[in-house]
């Protein structure tokens, strides 16, 4: 059944899972059961994916991933790719501060993803639940 109420932000690991030779069945089942119009990406994930592609040697795999990143993802998520704006920047500061105060530092990119999810009231879909252990709604379809 399609979830008509919640909206979601995909962590980079959720996006990159799609192009693995054998993607996680739990994540794929969740994606198929979720209304894709309620699923969003952050420019942060696009940056992390670009970095990963740039590190690959020239060849068919890199060419295929470049096409996926430059053409397929932007088309699939048209109007659902979220930028870093003033609200996200302010939420980022709160996120990093909360994690530091709790003795649980968070990486810069993860903090931007958490801040984007908080700002837009989205559930963050990730395999790395311990990276986002403080306030926020998390979903791990891998488990």
Task: Give short role names for the model-derived ranges.
Residues 15-16, 47-50, 133, 139:
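Nucleotide phosphate-binding site architecture
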Residues 2-6, 51-57, 75-123:
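Active-site neighborhoods of divalent-metal-dependent phosphate/nucleic-acid chemistry enzymes
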Residues 1-44, 54-71, 130:
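Short, well-structured N-terminal submotif of metal-dependent ribonuclease cores
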Residues 35, 77, 134-135:
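Short, structured coil segments at secondary-structure junctions
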């Amino acid at each position: 059944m399609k979830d008509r109420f919640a909206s979601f932000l995909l962590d980079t690991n959720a996006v990159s899972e799609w192009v693995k030779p054998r993607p996680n069945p739990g994540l794929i089942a969740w994606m198929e059961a979720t209304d894709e119009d309620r699923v969003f990406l952050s420019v942060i994930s696009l940056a992390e994916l670009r970095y990963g592609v740039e590190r690959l040697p020239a060849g068919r795999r890199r060419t295929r991933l470049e096409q996926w990143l430059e053409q397929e993802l932007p088309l699939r998520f048209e109007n659902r790719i979220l930028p870093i704006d003033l609200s996200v920047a302010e939420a980022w500061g709160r996120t990093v501060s909360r994690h530091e105060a709790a003795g649980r530092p968070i990486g810069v990119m993860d903090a931007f993803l958490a801040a984007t999810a908080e700002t837009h009231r989205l559930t963050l879909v990730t395999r790395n639940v311990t990276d986002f252990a403080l306030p926020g709604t998390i979903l791990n379809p891998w488990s």
